[in-house]
Amino acid sequence: MPSKFSCRQLRETGQRFENFLVDRGQDRETDRERLRTIYNQDFKTSFGTPAPGFSSMLYGMKIANLAYVTKTRVRFFGLDRWADVWFPEKRRMKPGLEMSKHHRSLLATIFHDRAEYMHGKHGVNVEVQGPHEARDGQLLIRLDLNRKEVLTLRLRNGGTQPVTLTHLFPFCRTPQFSFCNGDRELPCLLGPGECYELHVHCKTSFVGYFPATVLWELLGPGEPGSEGAGTFYIARFLAAVAHSPLAAQLKPTTPFKRTQVSRNPVVTRRIEEGERPDRAKNYDLEFSLPLGTYYPPPRLRQLLPVLLRGTSIFTAPKEIAEIKAQLQTTLKWRNYEVKLRLLLHLEELQMEHDIRHYDLESVPMTWDPIDRNPRLLTLEVPGVAESRPSVLRGDHLFALLSSETHHEDPVTYKGFVHKVELDRVKLSFSTSLLSRFVDGLTFKVNFTFNRQPLRVQHRALELTGRWPLEPMLFPVASRGVPLLPSDVKLKLYDRSLESNPEQLQAMKHIVMGTTRPAPYIIFGPPGTGKTVTLVEAIKQVVKHLPKAHILACAPSNSGADLLCQRLRVHLPSSIYRLLAPSRDIHLVPEDIKPCCNWDAKKGDFVFPSKKKLQEYRVLITTLITASRLVSAQFPIDHFTHIFIDEAGHAMEPESLVAIAGLMEVKEADNPGGQLVLAGDPRQLGPVLRCPLTQKHGLGYSLLERLLTFNALYKKGPDGYNPQFITKLLRNYRSHPTILDVPNRLYYDGELQACADVVDRERFCRWEGLPRQDFPIIFHGVMGKDEREGNSPSFFNPEEAATVTSYLKQLLAPSSKKGKARLSPRSVGVISPYRKQVEKIRYCITKLDKQLRGLDDIKDLKVGSVEEFQGQERSVILISTVRSSQSFVQLDLDFNLGFLKNPKRFNVAVTRAKALLIVVGNPLLLGHDPDWKVFLEFCKENGGYTGCPFPAKLDLQQGQNLLQGLSKLSPSTSGLKSHDYLPQEREGEEGLSLQVEPEWRNEL
């Protein structure tokens, strides 16, 4: 029966009830049943007029975003102050030996408090005999290959009273160690001066780092219950190491020391600005729609540290509870703007924190040798060529003279970037600084990031409220209005699509336009030709719809350039590529320069008027540059079609930049424009830095949100509804073997291997394969992940050396001197950690004589998974890097962090066309379900080599281990337990710094 109360009345009643609770001092009550009792017995009797039922009132408060409601709890507050997001995905259960949280905590205690376990107690200590080095709390045994070393660990009672050795636990999962403790059975009594020997045998046929831990459990002196009696523990941490010569050269140069983020930015009360690059020149595109600043609320900045602590919604202070509730509420149209705005603010606050890690102390600047107006200073910025940090023309940074850092009121100099050359930036500063400048003057430098992408995303969210976009962003149906007759014949520009029914189907539905106002999605798994399909659809729209005007976008410049290159073949005079003025013209492909806004005669970018741009049938931009068309207020009905390639890479607000203000949904007989999204939700999404935005949904692209949560795009018993979505099935890139695992894991086994047979089988007979005709190698390496200097990023010397060895085999010169059998351009090396990327590059360009001597070795790309998305190579090598420093870390619920990501795994293994080589720690990777499937696939098909493949832990051995460790409780050991692993957390801020993703440089 419908409620007799309106939503407004329900909301007003709820607000009066909330005030009623405040007046009675009961506003902290969250139990739903107790609140029901208060409402029915106390509040309703004092209400004065008929009041709605308790559940109806809660419903009114919930839909008004004024309460967070579960089956048992209720919390009242104003959600619209901050905004809310959707529930995080359920975490995967981890495979392997089932250990309770208690047991994991006890094992973690061993490693985390290892200094405590290494101390002798009651006069009992461990003597070590045999070849070893004591380093960082470990006994390091250096091994030559296939030569045995024996270490004796002698537990000696040096006290005055007897003790009892009750248990001995050797923790090791690798065959490099074997333990022998003689014939003495446990428990055994050790009188004063007596000892118990454990012989540790070490031998390996493989290079690597092999950890083990030995734990002795003893019963202290004295009668049970007397002073001094009780269980105590002593441990020793071992590591057998066999290095290759190359790995020995890659050891840490300096000990790792965590960087302290500067709390004292250089911006002071007095700021003097340099001269900005002249961007108004050649600019005829009128800006008539203002762009706000959209800074994060100051109060949100203050609350962020508390927000990150993980307090419960029902016990947190009210402001914190409000935000937390919003971060756990489903995304709906009614909260769309405020929710996504909150997430953007949180991401920006994390960016502000992360950018401080690039600040420089006491760095010199020099005069730019080229005499120009204005005079520029040159600053060396390591990493800027790789956008770490991103510095573009027009950006700014702050500099403070090193000699004035302790002055009471120093001047901060704001320098504007005029030019970027590799790792050098050229800056304009105020004339007062230039008048006193001499070469070599040193500065403290603070970097900033370009807020333009954030600002235009905020404006796009604002514009969603001005234009009726709900039927497009939260579609429920198609209006079924076609743009062309159903019997129209389409003559294809690319005849290859005729033999691909999925590509043909997608293209026809897009041209017909019957999906409107809902977006059409091209779901394109790796190598299936989604961009080819999208480009053909654009060409057909131009051909068959004479009044159509198209905006074609991608998140990246490379993606937009590719669209331009492929469209230009048949539409040379109909397209125009609009580049941002910060783009380095040297990076723009030569073949698209004639149809972009670069004026070669002027040597500068030009921006034609709105009237001129409207004459082109197709405009091509990045998503962010599309904001210039919004600022120019193109007519809302000018663009009939908006195509977004790589749509899965973009945050939803970023996709909105090219939609809100440029397209609307109209009445039923004219559904308005057609939005087309092409991408793959199973591959990497947007790169985010903030743990809260990662957890609560900003990582969802518009494409992935629709595919995941909207019924129109769900897969049914007969597949997807072709009126709204087409999944491409024919892979034109990879050998079937390389495609096998990702196909089964992520694409329901539907992908068909259609790559050219000659190309894909190029390495099936390569002598380096463990098994012929199986072009995948998993090379097991038990390495050690290291860090050095102030970089939190990990590297693994042994893996880097192994990768280098494979590269030498692959690129070995043929009979022609200096000419490689395989071009370095055809090879890619992927590693998730920035420091490992640096080490591998160092190996191939500096350390290895054979590789560094190749003329084109610099064409061999080494980079992160993100840097390879959308790319392919004949050969891909992957170094996974992470390993372990102790058995405890290795065998527990190890935090794989950056590796434990199905999308990242999928992208990494699907870049290869003909040969895939993975170098990593099989024992560690086997804890992840996807890596485990891949490992077993390699093992079963003969593609595994390297260190022995780990056997499964015997179930009874595991039970005995747990039973013994159950005695390791804090109450008996006197040591505190830990609910976390000793491994440094890889969520929150730590992960983004270890991986060090590129900073955005696409405008």
Swiss-Prot record:
- Transmembrane domains' residue ranges: none
Keyword Acetylation included in the entry's annotation: yes
Question: What GO terms in the biological process aspect are recorded for it?
Answer: 3'-UTR-mediated mRNA destabilization; miRNA-mediated gene silencing by mRNA destabilization; miRNA-mediated post-transcriptional gene silencing; positive regulation of mRNA catabolic process; regulation of neuron projection arborization; regulatory ncRNA-mediated post-transcriptional gene silencing; transposable element silencing; transposable element silencing by mRNA destabilization
A Pfam entry, by short name:
AAA_12
Residue numbers bearing the Phosphothreonine modification = 160, 254
Q: Positions of the region Disordered?
A: 968-1003
Its localization reads: Cytoplasm, P-body; Cytoplasm, Cytoplasmic ribonucleoprotein granule; Cytoplasm, Stress granule; Nucleus
Query: Does the keyword section mention Secreted?
Result: no
What enzyme class is recorded for this protein? hydrolase
Q: Where is this region: Interaction with AGO2 and APOBEC3G?
A: 921-965
Chain span(s) of sequence motif DEAG box: 645-648
> What residues bind ATP, as annotated?
524-531
- Where does the record place the modification N6-acetyllysine? 148
Primary location:
cytoplasm
Keywords, A to Z, come to:
Acetylation, ATP-binding, Cytoplasm, Helicase, Hydrolase, Nucleotide-binding, Nucleus, Phosphoprotein, RNA-binding, RNA-mediated gene silencing, Ubl conjugation
Residue ranges the record marks as coiled coil: none
Query: Residues where Phosphoserine occurs?
Result: 432, 969, 977
Gene Ontology CC entries for this record: cytoplasmic ribonucleoprotein granule; cytoplasmic stress granule; cytosol; nucleus; P granule; P-body
Recorded GO MF terms: 5'-3' RNA helicase activity; ATP binding; ATP hydrolysis activity; RNA binding
Q: Where is the composition biased (Basic and acidic residues)?
A: 976-985
Q: Which reaction does it catalyse?
A: ATP + H2O = ADP + phosphate + H(+)
Q: What job does the chain carry out? A: 5' to 3' RNA helicase that is involved in a number of cellular roles ranging from mRNA metabolism and translation, modulation of viral infectivity, inhibition of retrotransposition, or regulation of synaptic transmission. Plays an important role in innate antiviral immunity by promoting type I interferon production. Mechanistically, specifically uses IKKepsilon/IKBKE as the mediator kinase for IRF3 activation. Contributes to UPF1 mRNA target degradation by translocation along 3' UTRs. Required for microRNA (miRNA)-mediated gene silencing by the RNA-induced silencing complex (RISC).
How does the annotation summarize its subunit structure? Answer: Interacts with DICER1, AGO2, TARBP2, EIF6 and RPL7A (60S ribosome subunit); they form a large RNA-induced silencing complex (RISC). Interacts with APOBEC3G in an RNA-dependent manner. Interacts with TRIM71 (via NHL repeats) in an RNA-dependent manner. Interacts with both protein products of LIRE1, ORF1p and ORF2p. Interacts with TUT4 and, to a lesser extent, TUT7; the interactions are RNA-dependent. Interacts with AGO2, TNRC6B and UPF1; the interactions are direct and RNA-dependent.
Protein name per its UniProtKB record: Putative helicase MOV-10
Gene for this chain: MOV10
